[in-house]
Amino acid sequence: MLGLDENQPVSKKRKRTVPKSDEKSGRRIHENITRDPVIANSHSSGGQVLLLEKQIQDSQRHYNNIVTLYSLATSQAEEEKQRLAAVAALCRVFCRLLADGRLSKSNGASQNDLVVVDWLKARYADLQNFLLECVSSIDTFNMTALTLSMALIKSEMSNPRTSLDQLWRTGFFSRMLATILESSDNEDLLHKFVDSYAQQFDDVRHYTFVIIA
């Protein structure tokens, strides 16, 4: 499984509870989210990855680059830095696609366009499943996988394809929260979620309580 820089400090285990549901920060996840330095630094990791990402951004003719990036991210044969760069690039790609409405079927769309949307949604599901697998792993990459997952969730909430309430209750967020709660051997993961998200964003805290109630 992927790992971060071994020099990066690992938080000490401590007791932590989800903040009370009536404690308000006045912030929502789609309004702001702190970027993990590892995600930002991945821009400088691997010219091949950046080229593939740019080609996807330039034209849908290069959407097959998504498959290539996914292969790089999941391949045990690739260097750790390259794999991390690839999965971060994939998240940026899908954040843009969500913002552009490319994962939504529009009225009057051609059959070819509908096929493309279905294909993109399938690739997005692949990425989500991979991130959840990483979140559930007992290594330091699960922290970055959590941050990447929350970045995608932010994009989903900013560009909803259905009602926000349904997205929170049944979408990627609910699956990710279940994965965190099932990772009983990794308290640091829960601490990260509580400190960075549940305490910081009203909507994350509210739907955390809604889902676990």
Indicate where each model-derived feature is located.
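Charge-rich, low-complexity intrinsically disordered regions
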Residues: 1-213
